Amino acid sequence: MASEELFEAEFSEEQDLEHQQAMETEEAELAETEEPLEITEESPDNPEAESTTEQLTEKPVTNGNKAPADNEAKMTQLPLARIRNIMKLDPDLHMANNEAVFIVAKAVELFIASLSRESYTYTAQSKKKTIQKRDVDMAISAVDSLLFLDGAMNF
């Protein structure tokens, strides 16, 4: 199982674009249509349900400056501040905006997931449940796209 097959099957940019477009259209539809909700209550005096219409206003989802930053922080499992600090260690990089840090964080998460899947195949072959260093080494040597990590596990 090569990592290229995993990326083609699960991580397509077209799916992301379609999902993003669907979310934007849903937000636009919700913002345009605010309908009153009917709440029916039964009273002890009247056994039949009385219909009352109440106007309930919901706060529409806005694309403010704080909302995306909060959502981005919640969507990643790695700390964005630490990734920003690691990125700043590069002398060619002067500034990194939030979007760049978020993209790098997501890319690192996908890379770690791919490496762990490849490593787990060797763990499962040896009938173990815990991924060990030798499993990661075997995955690195077996998958062509991971060969750049050869020797990185020697510490």
Swiss-Prot record:
Its main location: nucleus. Keywords: Nucleus. One of its GO terms (biological process) is DNA-templated DNA replication. Residues 1-76 are annotated as: Disordered. Pfam families: CBFD_NFYB_HMF. Component of the DNA polymerase epsilon complex consisting of four subunits: the catalytic subunit PolE1/DNApol-epsilon255 and the accessory subunits PolE2/DNApol-epsilon58, Chrac-14/DNApolE3 and PolE4/Mes4. This is DNA polymerase epsilon subunit 4. The gene is PolE4.
